[in-house]
Amino acid sequence: MERQLDAYCEHLRSERQVSPHTLSAYRRDLEKVLGWCQKQNIGSWAALDIQRLRSLIARLHQQGQSSRSLARLLSAVRGLYHYLNREGLCDHDPATGLAPPKGERRLPKTLDTDRALQLLEGAVEDDFLARRDQAILELFYSSGLRLSELTGLNLDQLDLADGMVQVLGKGSKTRLLPVGRKAREALEQWLPLRALTNPADDAVFVSQQGRRLGPRAIQLRVKAAGERELGQNLHPHMLRHSFASHLLESSQDLRAVQELLGHSDIKTTQIYTHLDFQHLATVYDSAHPRAKRIKGDES
């Protein structure tokens, strides 16, 4: 069983080219199943049936595993058995028809509008770190980017003249997002300072040594801003949740918000497939508290 698990993980790495993070998560889940099988004297993957797998899921749920974690584990099992069936090592999938126990969905933490404005409207020092961090905060809240999307952002993805940014989201899917006026202003003040570092690549956000900022560095800068301005813990995804919450509260247009967030769930995607970007931009411009244009501002 261990050899077959190793072979499957190598298949994921070399042929499917899954990310190291995903591979590590799948391996942890499958090793959990393997360990349980060994304790139950199940000597092969072919001997694991739906009743025994259901017992494992129930046991893990009783031990406090979340519904989301169990769904991921079942997904890993299905992937393994798809591989085993293809290789002629098994003729069934014990995860077929199994679903994780339903659990309470935790509501995402958000800032209310007043707290978001408090975070963003404080005085900004005219120096490298302050201008860069302000641009990061504004862009997170303006456009609802994921941390990975902001970290990977390059100069050619920004169009400040038209107030647009193209991001590379999950599954290597691109989407076009509006950039609010306040975020554009913050970026325009940051980019000349960025150029002074003679950056090593086209990253929008770089260190004082000109190197692209990694996820951890950005998390720490956002956390520091939250502690300084709000006296609370703050992380990038809280700004993304706040973006979505405030936009939905103002617009009541769930489909537009889902499109702007880049959610890939087919059940939600099908609802707003036919919405064009102009509609999304109109919803964004009229509803987002940091994007509303001043009268006469056509830029």
Curated annotation (Swiss-Prot):
Residues 106-285 form the Tyr recombinase domain. CDD domains: INT_XerDC_C. InterPro entries: CB (IPR044068), DNA_brk_join_enz (IPR011010), Integrase-like_cat_sf (IPR013762), Integrase_catalytic (IPR002104), Integrase_recombinase_N (IPR010998), Integrase_SAM-like_N (IPR004107), Recomb_XerC (IPR011931), Tyrosine_recombinase_XerC/XerD (IPR023009). One of its GO terms (cellular component) is cytoplasm. GO terms for molecular function: DNA binding; tyrosine-based site-specific recombinase activity. Keywords: Cell cycle, Cell division, Chromosome partition, Cytoplasm, DNA integration, DNA recombination, DNA-binding. Its main location: cytoplasm. One of its GO terms (biological process) is cell division. Transmembrane segments: none annotated. Residues 1-85 form the Core-binding (CB) domain. Gene3D superfamilies: 1.10.150.130, Intergrase catalytic core. It is found in: Cytoplasm. The active site is at 146, 170, 237, 240, 263, 272 (o-(3'-phospho-dna)-tyrosine intermediate). Forms a cyclic heterotetrameric complex composed of two molecules of XerC and two molecules of XerD. HAMAP family: Recomb_XerC_XerD. Site-specific tyrosine recombinase, which acts by catalyzing the cutting and rejoining of the recombining DNA molecules. The XerC-XerD complex is essential to convert dimers of the bacterial chromosome into monomers to permit their segregation at cell division. It also contributes to the segregational stability of plasmids. Belongs to the 'phage' integrase family. XerC subfamily. NCBIfam families: PRK00283.1, recomb_XerC. This is Tyrosine recombinase XerC. It comes from Pseudomonas fluorescens. The lineage of its organism: Bacteria, Pseudomonadati, Pseudomonadota, Gammaproteobacteria, Pseudomonadales.
